[in-house]
Amino acid sequence: MKKFISRYGKMTLVALFGLCIFLFWYCGYPQALCYQEQNQLFLWSADYFWHDLSVAGGLADYISEFLVQFYYIPVLGAAILAFLFLAFLSLTYQVIRSYTAKPLKWYGMLMALLPSILLLEVMGDIEVLLSFPIALTLALLSTWLMNLATRRWGARIAWADVLLTPVLFWLIGGGATWLYVFLRLAFFLMQVKKGKLPSVAIAYPLSILYLWAIQLICYSTLLVQYPLMSVMTGINYYRVPMQYPGQKWGYDKDLYALLKLNEQVRNGKWEDIIHDAQESQVQVFYTSNCVNLALAQTRQLADRMFSFYQSGENALLAPRSRDNMSMYPTMEAFWRLGLVNSSLRYASDLQASILNGKMSGRLMKRITECQIVNGKYAVARKNIDL
């Protein structure tokens, strides 16, 4: 048994972890995939690529937006996240191993699991963007490769850090680059202590001041429109400006119920909406809108409307509000009632309410449909060509 654990323990642990991540996103939390996908619009164009790359962290943001578009199919979204978490876990293990230069026991993989579990907790926040784990993964990859290069070529490789640090800052953002710098600093200090690097390498802590200076220069010249804290910790990691991943803790049952309703309305799961409302219904106007829309679509509204919670005069059609969620069921209701211009107005307002200024594939589709119905074919064709 001990021989089996020693030989296959790490492989089994990694496989189980990947399976758990896949099942979590596919079976337990698919509504988050829908929410992420509907709040962005990836464009296959060189202009879009260079637009993303014009901001610090742009490469991580571009890769994340490319991957998130596949969340439209939940099984693909769950598979992408499982692969990303496995890459993060494997690189965490390799970075830990690079500090010791010795193979780790199977419990070394357990140690490497802790950052992955913390990352999963952070990703539970619906406003955390995929660019955050991608940036961290790229930072770990850079750390691992540079640690291996330092073992081979010694302190001379430190000059590569002088060039790599600003490049990483611009490609993956401030927070992930700080992770890279501190991990490299720990590696250099350990090697100096073991006598494997000359004592001059003790000057590597100056890299902290170096990165700070790079960020201040970029803040004062290229990124003047962003707050200093966002430049230092990451611009594209969190959808809400001036807030950062990891600030929210706990399980918000009502929020996840609303996210599930949003996914069900989008995919026309009317019977599921009614069934869930019979079990439990959050008492806000959003749920009244969704349930009443489901009842109308299944021709039960007149008979069963008052069997469910009704929020008041806004239970059927909600007024406009300044957020990127509340108006979706009303937009859908207007579309099905044939009130095309009202649906168009709500879709446009929803798109303008996305907090990080992105467009939405779901909303652009509805806007295009409304333009076609209104006979504005040139505008609709322009949207389709996006």
What would you call each of these model-derived segments?
Residues 30-70, 117-130, 212-242:
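Membrane-interfacial interhelical loops
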Residues 35, 53, 57, 81, ...:
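Membrane-interface micro-motifs in multi-pass membrane enzymes
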Residues 244-386:
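Soluble catalytic regions of membrane-associated enzymes that act on cell-envelope
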Residues 71-86:
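Loop-to-helix entry region of an early transmembrane alpha helix in multi-pass inner-membrane enzymes
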Residues 3-4, 93-106, 149-157, 190-201:
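Membrane-interface helix-boundary motifs at transmembrane edges
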Residues 84, 88-96, 138-150, 186-191:
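Transmembrane alpha-helical segments
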Residues 126-130, 148-194, 208-219:
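Transmembrane helices and adjacent periplasmic/lumenal helix-loop junctions
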Residues 1-21:
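Start-transfer (signal-anchor) and selected internal transmembrane alpha helices
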